[in-house]
């Protein structure tokens, strides 16, 4: 009987803590609405809001837009599908939401203005998933191979040759040429990197530049608008996957400068990243079918 009583007390205490957290989060979620009114005009993608799943131990506290779309309300609790790292900042489909994509964060993200910008970074990924990501991804040979092998974490675990000395030198060099306005030389270096990497590694590079680079591109647009320091981390040696956040962002800015309005169509943006000449990038990368836009 004592064990049952103790268990009941623990359960009640946990429930009370969860209720306190939900209550404290409610006004913080509403600030997302206010920020969107400020940053939404920067790009059509930022005009979309998505569910927010806050990690509380081994469960999600899921908030979604109310019926009026003018505020967030608590929707439900759900078990986390896998252990969540401390300070998680992510976006992925949730079974509890019938596979709708959600921003997944830990509670301290709401403690700073930059944290709210991070939420919108993750909303960009939600928009990618909601529009063209599944179709684009399905045309990548590296994705098909990963699915055949049951490797669902391939985007994080892909064995990209970051340590290759030529790549580590030329990738930042191409970005530097873009920044200096020397587009032809930047694209020559880029073409050399494509040959160096081979088809599969090049697919991975382009995928990460499109997915994470575009989110970083809009993240920095928001930070500039809010008079906050931009995020340009990722190119310090040794290079890691985060290099493609910064590299992708700068490459996208370069491409947008050559083709105004390019970022308004996510599929075309991917095509240009894969082949800046505007020609077909090869069957393994170039998507087919309709071209959903970000609107």
Language-model region placement:
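Catalytic zinc-binding patch centered on the HExxH motif and its immediate surroundings
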Residues: 70-99, 111
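Post-HExxH zinc-binding segment in Zn-dependent metallohydrolases
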Residues: 130-230, 259
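N-terminal mature-domain "stem" immediately C-terminal to a signal peptide or N-terminal signal-anchor/transmembrane
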Residues: 19-78, 109, 215
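Sec-dependent signal peptide recognition
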Residues: 2-9
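Short pre-active-site segment immediately N-terminal to the catalytic Zn-binding motif
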Residues: 104-119
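Active-site recognition of the HExxH zinc-binding catalytic motif
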Residues: 117-130
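Hydrophobic h-region of N-terminal signal peptides that target proteins for export
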Residues: 9-18
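Pan-zinc metallopeptidase signature
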Residues: 189-295
């Amino acid at each position: 009987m004592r064990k049952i009583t103790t268990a009941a007390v623990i359960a009640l205490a946990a429930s009370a803590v969860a209720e306190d957290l939900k209550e404290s989060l409610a006004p913080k979620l509403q600030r997302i609405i206010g920020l969107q009114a400020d940053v939404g005009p920067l790009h059509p993608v930022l005009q979309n809001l998505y569910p927010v799943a806050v990690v509380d131990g081994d469960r999600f506290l899921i908030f979604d837009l109310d019926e009026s779309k003018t505020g967030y309300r608590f929707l439900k609790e759900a078990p986390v599908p896998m252990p969540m790292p401390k300070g998680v900042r992510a976006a992925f489909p949730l079974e509890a939401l019938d596979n709708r994509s959600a921003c997944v964060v830990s509670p301290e993200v709401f403690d700073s203005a930059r944290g709210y910008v991070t939420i919108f970074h993750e909303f960009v990924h939600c928009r990618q998933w909601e529009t063209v990501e599944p179709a684009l991804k399905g045309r990548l040979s590296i994705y098909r191979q990963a699915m055949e092998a049951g490797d669902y974490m391939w985007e994080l675990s892909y064995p990209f040759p970051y340590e290759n000395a030529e790549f580590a030198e030329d990738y930042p060099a191409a970005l530097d040429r873009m920044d200096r306005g020397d587009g032809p030389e930047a694209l020559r270096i880029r073409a050399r990197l494509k040959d160096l990497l081979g088809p599969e590694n090049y697919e991975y590079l382009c995928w990460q530049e499109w997915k994470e680079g575009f989110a970083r591109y809009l993240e920095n647009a928001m930070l500039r608008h809010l008079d906050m320091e931009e995020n340009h981390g990722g190119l310090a040696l040794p290079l890691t996957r985060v290099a493609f956040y910064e590299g992708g962002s700068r490459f996208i800015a370069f491409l947008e400068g050559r083709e105004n309005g390019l970022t308004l169509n996510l599929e075309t943006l991917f095509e240009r990243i894969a082949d800046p000449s505007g020609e077909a990038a090869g069957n393994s990368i170039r998507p087919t079918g309709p071209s959903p836009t970000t609107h």
